[in-house]
Structure formats: structure tokens, C-alpha cells
Amino acid sequence: MSDIVYMGNKALYLILIFSLWPVGIATVIGLSIGLLQTVTQLQEQTLPFGIKLIGVSISLLLLSGWYGEVLLSFCHEIMFLIKSGV
């Protein structure tokens, strides 16, 4: 039972870590574009969305190798627990 709770806890932790970078990048881009729009009094609504989309896409592209390694390691751990009869 404790192994199942451990795996559930680790899965939630991985979800938190995986979502941290894209959300953080979108937040930083949104704040900086919002500040730039405030200073220049530009009222374009689609500008932050497009730039955030590009930023998050680039971050996911750059981090996809690391995401794959961590997720594969987690899956191996789960398969080992299933094989051992938990």
C-alpha cells in the first residue's frame, strides 16, 4: 500500500515539475508584455497571447528530452513495482 501512495505522490510531483517551466515562462512573458503595453499605451489584446504561445512552445521543445527521460524513468519504476507484485 505504501508503494502505491509513493507512486501517486511521485506522479503528482512530476506533474508539478513538468508544468512549472511552461507556466513560469508564460507568466514572465505576460508580465513583461503587459508592462510594455502599459508604458506604450498599446491596447492590442492578441499580442501577449501570440508571444506566450511561441514562448511556451519553445520551452516545451527544448525541455522535451528531459521530460522524456524523467517520464521513462518513472514508467520503469512503476513497471518494476507491478512486476514485483504490489
Curated annotation (Swiss-Prot):
Q: How does it sit in the membrane?
A: Multi-pass membrane protein
* Biological function: Required for surface presentation of invasion plasmid antigens. Could play a role in preserving the translocation competence of the Ipa antigens. Required for invasion and for secretion of the three Ipa proteins.
Instruction: List the Pfam families.
Output: Bac_export_3
For this record, the Gene Ontology CC terms, alphabetical, are: plasma membrane
Q: Which organism is it from?
A: Shigella flexneri
Q: Which family does the similarity line name?
A: Belongs to the FliQ/MopD/SpaQ family.
NCBIfam families linked = fliQ_rel_III, PRK15333.1
Q: Which domain of life is it from?
A: Bacteria
Q: Does the keyword Metal-binding apply?
A: no
Q: What are the transmembrane regions?
A: 11-31, 54-74
Q: Which InterPro entries match?
A: Bac_export_3, T3SS_HrpO
What does the entry give for GO biological process? Answer: protein secretion
Q: For this UniProt record, give its keywords in alphabetical order, as a comma-separated list.
A: Cell membrane, Membrane, Plasmid, Transmembrane, Transmembrane helix, Virulence
Q: What is this protein called?
A: Surface presentation of antigens protein SpaQ
Q: Where in the cell is it found?
A: Cell membrane
